[in-house]
Amino acid sequence: MNLSVTFHSDNLQQLERAAYCDLNQIVTLLPCAELLRDPAAMCNEMGAQFREVTINGALVAGVRFLVYAPHASSVAVIGDFNGWHAKECQLTRLQQPNIDSGLWGIFIPNLQAGERYKYQLSDQYGNQLPDKTDPWGYYAEQYPSFCSLTYQQSCYQWQDEMWQTRPVTAKHQQPLSFYELHIGSWRRHDNGDFYTYRELAQTLIPYLTEMGYTHLELMPVSEHPFHGSWGYQPIGLFAPTSRFGSPDDFKYFIDQCHQAGLGVVLDWVPAHFPADEHGLANFDGTALYNDPDPRRGWHQDWKSYIYDYGRDHVRQFLVSNALFWFEHFHIDGLRVDAVASMLYLDYSRNDGEWIPNADGGNYNYDAISLLRWINEEVYSHYPNAMMIAEESTAFPGVSKPTSLGGLGFGFKWNMGWMHDSLAYIKEESIYRRYHHNTITMPLLYAFSENYILSLSHDEVVYGKGSLMNKMPGDEWQQTANLRAYLGYMYGQPGKKLNFMGTEIGQTAEWNHDDQLQWFLLQFARHQGMKQLVKDLNHMYCAYPALYQLDCDPAGFEWRISDAADDSLLVHERFDIVENKVLVASNFTPVPREQYRIGVPLEGTYELILNTDNSLYCGSDYSLITTIKTEVKGSHGLPYSIAMVIPPLATVFYRFIPNPA
């Protein structure tokens, strides 16, 4: 944007040294009211934006600062460029006739990228507040300064055009296998230093493509002051954390992911913000971003503030941030954290600790309408995007379109499946017969939403132990149980998500201050686990019957669901042209010989994967690789097969019908 201005001073050098120009005089903006209504424009207008203005006929580049602080009596920008003296750079309050926008702005010539700055505000009574980082800042320093840094979004030259212009696809009919990762603890250097974004591009991306994952899901990368929050206490929603490099470095990482055919989803945290004094808390001397009543504005469990979803500027701030990550970082999706805490006014509260809505209920209508708006905006601007909800309740229609009364997400994590299946598999095999309904229960609601089966970081922290250590039995049985369980997961309807370390059979609980236990790969059972997960991913992507109807009941049929005494489950999966894959899981250490299973059609079942294979450090129990159907009715069906199902194993067979 080229901006014109007339100055009374003829001394350009003196002007540049003074360097601070009244924004009302020099900047032609969108009308303030329009700016505050357009989230797509806000992420490119608010904060520190590089602009050019004409001063006495000369084109001068600089930075325009724009911040929302309606209750402040004064706002200044301070930094190295003015010796951190607030008097040098007082912002001007932007007003129109009969309208106070709440915006403050200034243009400072000749600032470069990488300039350190903060805002210094005084409240409505003239009291100076703690210096603030830019709510819209694109780049920030770490402790102790937490300074914002000027950054120009347009400098990075993307090379992912083929990925960005690929045809729009129905994601619920695609194979989606997510690798959930915490950047700071996947790998560390020998001295304990983090891998940078660029180093990860050279190491992580080849690893994930070899392993057959389709998407990387990153735990929150938005800037956060406390490493131990894992990113879930963000201060800078518009800034990828500088712990691992610059915004350009992060763009490079995503660019390389796309060139390798790997999608990138970010965990996103619109549910709350931390109380750190340099952030949004008490920003202009008031509860600008949260409800001042702690019954609505304070999260007791997380000791953080809850956004006030009924305020226009908060809603637009969050919608703008969601759009920002797609526009400027080419991400492929957002996984929205802690949705349940947004939906319910009484979330984690006792009687008397919350305020009902206008109808006397516990739904947060403002949050519900905001989530719908966010999803509508994202899918409108980016039709290939994925919006994913981490929602732990039975709230109706989470992944139903807003036009049909839903929240408008594309997918929802299946927390019920995770809870029930883990509860079952943790039982000693001899007792599983008494908990059979626990493992079959999730199929009663498997198609009520577009589900992702998630084995996330939440299940391997806070004393819960690793997935491997949840498994009962001796070392061999633990490993076999986990192999069988992962096989069962990949055969179930629903997209797949595994937290890092699952694929190597991590034995220790996840520790954000250390890397994964890569040394385990020197042992055969862990190498076997890695090979199994790799083969499960590649098999899953190769057979449409395992993914195409993940969200449609037409894609799943039980063959045996009631064999509680045998702790055995058999089902078939279908694609849209009725190709079939049969999946059988034996959750006991007793092999099942000549186990008869009813099937509807004549043909041949051909083995495609066996989790008990010696390749995976299994027992390699002898089984039948090709099974012909028999004209012998069973389980209410006209044909049947006699299978051998190895101990503590899941096997996959593809169906080949007899020629017509």
Which positions does each model-derived feature cover?
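Substrate-binding/active-site clefts of carbohydrate-active enzymes
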Residues: E141, E161-Q173, H182-Y363, I627, ...
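C-terminal beta-strand-rich structural cap/linker in extracellular carbohydrate-active enzymes
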Residues: A113-R116, I624-A660
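The feature marks proteins involved in alpha-glucan
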Residues: M1-R64, L94-E180, S185-G192, E199, ...
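Solvent-exposed beta-strand/loop surfaces of large extracellular or lumenal domains
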Residues: F81-L103, D612-G636
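Short proline/glycine-enriched turn/loop motifs at strand-loop junctions of beta-rich domains
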Residues: Y68-V75, P600-G603
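Catalytic cores of secreted or luminal carbohydrate-active enzymes
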Residues: R525-L546
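Conserved, mostly hydrophobic/aromatic
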Residues: V67, Y119, L181, L208, ...
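Conserved alpha/beta catalytic core and glycan-binding cleft of carbohydrate-active enzymes
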Residues: Y143, H330-D332, Y347-Q515, L520, ...
